[in-house]
Amino acid sequence: MLLIGCLVVVAIALGFYQEQLKISINYILENAPRIAGFYGLNEEQKHQAIEAQRFTAPFDYYHSHETLRWLYKMNELQLLRLKWAVTFVSLLVFFVINASLLRLLEGNSRVLTRLALIYLIFTTLAFAIYAVGKLMSMPDQTYAISRRITGALQSLVPVMIFWPFLRLSKQNNT
């Protein structure tokens, strides 16, 4: 039981950090084009420019905290690559956490194949939706959908849905 509790705490902490990281990356990527010569500025100048813009813009409920300062060392391409890397690493880490929790809760590893299939299907769906949006020149609309799908996979949502489903299936089969 202690291990389950530890995994849940780790998942919550990692979830908050990866979300803060991606929000900061997105905020910089979205606002940098509004600042002349942004990527030519040094780290402190980038930070000051973004923060000055944040204080003059309407309140952003999604990004109401200061960005992670170490991100200002990166250029646009590095930020884009980091965003994708964080997405893939988070998917993998949360798959391992969800798989570990299911293994501990169920006591067998047969459910892990099903969980892997669920992750594969929904990850493929999310990236297909995003790709179609890019091809149809409407990436903002499809990004929001794919972000919600991958966001659910980068959390404890899979185990919160899958484990009760497994328990109900066992009860119905007995």
Region roles according to the model:
Residues 104-106, 130-142:
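Juxtamembrane "helix-exit" motif on the non-cytosolic side of transmembrane helices
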Residues 30-65:
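Long, glycine/tryptophan/cysteine-rich extracytoplasmic
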Residues 96-97, 154-168:
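Hydrophobic cores of alpha-helical transmembrane segments in multi-pass inner/ER membrane proteins
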Residues 57-94:
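Individual transmembrane alpha-helix segments
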Residues 140-153:
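Non-cytosolic membrane-interface motifs at loop->transmembrane helix junctions
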Residues 103-114, 171-174:
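Membrane-interface helix-boundary motifs at transmembrane edges
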Residues 1-39:
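N-terminal signal-anchor transmembrane alpha helix
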Residues 9-15, 122-132:
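Aromatic-anchored segments of alpha-helical transmembrane domains
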